Amino acid sequence: MDKKRHVHFIGIGGSGMNGIAAIMLGLGYRVTGSDLKPSAATRRLEALGATCYTRHAEENLGDADLVVASTAIPPDNIELVEARKRGLPVMHRADLLAWLMRRQKGIAVAGAHGKTTTTSMTALVLEKNGMDPTIVIGGELSEIGGNAKLGRGEYLVAEADESDGSFLKLDPVIEIITNIEDDHLDYYRSVENILAAFRRFMAKVPESGLAVACLDDPRLRELLAGYDRPCLTYALDNPEADYTMRNIRLMRQVTAGDVYYRGGFLGCLELSVPGRHNLSNAMAAVAVGRFVGLAFEGIAAALKDFRGAGRRFQLTGEVNGIKVIDDYAHHPSEIKATLKAAGQVKTGRVVGVFQPHRYTRTLFLGERFGEAFEDADVVIISDIYSAGEKPIEGVSAKTIVSAIEKHNGRKVIYLPTRQEIVDYLVQMARPGDMILTMGAGDIWSAGIELVKRLKENQKIG
């Protein structure tokens, strides 16, 4: 790697790619990349000195001596084919992240849900306490002005992507595992295979390192039985964990609880972000912070300043008392947690707008979506965002609509397109409503358009 000076990223705007590209720029590498359209991520990289092309073409490679791609890039991609024709080394994004992690001590955050928020919280704890970590996150963290930052300290904090098994390429010193769910079954095919992958991941922890695991999660409890590496556990509901929380307060302005370590009181933890699940995420950051030598008071102060990660209960806008919030939630458990958080801070109706993500996820988890929307007063479902998948016969957004109606016994509003959703919401929204756009696709843009339309109507009125 040290002899390679020009790195080309195929799909440079992707959430797993652009942060690594930014770090490579900071290390002095020449960075080029391609994507199908410009984005905030590509514009930010260009401001840092990268060259970003808005189409895939052989000539984009230029004189690159290393090409980086993710699992999302198909093998017949024109740039990938050209790179192999030239005999250029092609590296998976996780291999490059692993190389970066070897330059420092890696802290990797894995799990079905909460990775981005927990990574952001952990990174902020180290950053605010003067440890100057390198940070690579899948979402935006306002405190660092993006999703990546090159630090000169001892640690690198990063998300570990289990969706394609590539987290097994990493060799962190510290691991956080938030939970294990039956997601990404298009890759793993069975829960047993998911558990086997996490077992291998946890076995990577060295004797000098630490695994931090949530004891509230039943599948993690299963993996921890007989686990022989250094480990600390945390929980909100399991008193056997090393880190526990009592006196939990879920209020409109603050989310708080009292933190204990092996029965000893450490102090109160207050968050500005809503949701009981965020207290759990914060407990993982507390465990890591104390392991690397930080005082609880400094950790708690940093977490109190945390304003949330991009697309994680993020305010899109507020017009005439109508709040529009966006969240990446796309798994039933994530949707349930997001809507419960909304219930904590709502002043009127909670309107859940969900764009299903992938045909395979809808196929495998369709019935479980039925119970995910219990805390929404109004539910709107759009067509599936395919993420490049081919349609599956008999699987559609109506699979989820039927599951919700069967579970809740009430009508779900099916609006296939974002435009239909915006038109409907402009007419039905009223002061006090909290409208949540949820999904891993492009449903966020409906929220932006809705805020724009509501503002226009306000001017006319």
Swiss-Prot record:
<dbReference type="GO" id="GO:0005524">
    <property type="term" value="F:ATP binding"/>
</dbReference>
<dbReference type="InterPro" id="IPR050061">
    <property type="entry name" value="MurCDEF_pg_biosynth"/>
</dbReference>
<dbReference type="Pfam" id="PF01225">
    <property type="entry name" value="Mur_ligase"/>
</dbReference>
<comment type="pathway">
    <text>Cell wall biogenesis; peptidoglycan biosynthesis.</text>
</comment>
<dbReference type="InterPro" id="IPR013221">
    <property type="entry name" value="Mur_ligase_cen"/>
</dbReference>
<dbReference type="Pfam" id="PF08245">
    <property type="entry name" value="Mur_ligase_M"/>
</dbReference>
<keyword id="KW-0573">Peptidoglycan synthesis</keyword>
<protein>
    <recommendedName>
        <fullName>UDP-N-acetylmuramate--L-alanine ligase</fullName>
        <ecNumber>6.3.2.8</ecNumber>
    </recommendedName>
</protein>
<dbReference type="GO" id="GO:0051301">
    <property type="term" value="P:cell division"/>
</dbReference>
<keyword id="KW-0961">Cell wall biogenesis/degradation</keyword>
<keyword id="KW-0963">Cytoplasm</keyword>
<dbReference type="InterPro" id="IPR036615">
    <property type="entry name" value="Mur_ligase_C_dom_sf"/>
</dbReference>
<keyword id="KW-0067">ATP-binding</keyword>
<dbReference type="GO" id="GO:0071555">
    <property type="term" value="P:cell wall organization"/>
</dbReference>
<dbReference type="GO" id="GO:0008360">
    <property type="term" value="P:regulation of cell shape"/>
</dbReference>
<dbReference type="GO" id="GO:0008763">
    <property type="term" value="F:UDP-N-acetylmuramate-L-alanine ligase activity"/>
</dbReference>
<keyword id="KW-0131">Cell cycle</keyword>
<dbReference type="InterPro" id="IPR000713">
    <property type="entry name" value="Mur_ligase_N"/>
</dbReference>
<feature type="binding site">
    <location>
        <begin position="111"/>
        <end position="117"/>
    </location>
    <ligand>
        <name>ATP</name>
    </ligand>
</feature>
<keyword id="KW-0132">Cell division</keyword>
<comment type="function">
    <text>Cell wall formation.</text>
</comment>
<dbReference type="GO" id="GO:0005737">
    <property type="term" value="C:cytoplasm"/>
</dbReference>
<dbReference type="GO" id="GO:0009252">
    <property type="term" value="P:peptidoglycan biosynthetic process"/>
</dbReference>
<keyword id="KW-0436">Ligase</keyword>
<keyword id="KW-0547">Nucleotide-binding</keyword>
<dbReference type="Pfam" id="PF02875">
    <property type="entry name" value="Mur_ligase_C"/>
</dbReference>
<dbReference type="InterPro" id="IPR005758">
    <property type="entry name" value="UDP-N-AcMur_Ala_ligase_MurC"/>
</dbReference>
<keyword id="KW-0133">Cell shape</keyword>
<dbReference type="InterPro" id="IPR004101">
    <property type="entry name" value="Mur_ligase_C"/>
</dbReference>
<comment type="similarity">
    <text>Belongs to the MurCDEF family.</text>
</comment>
<dbReference type="InterPro" id="IPR036565">
    <property type="entry name" value="Mur-like_cat_sf"/>
</dbReference>
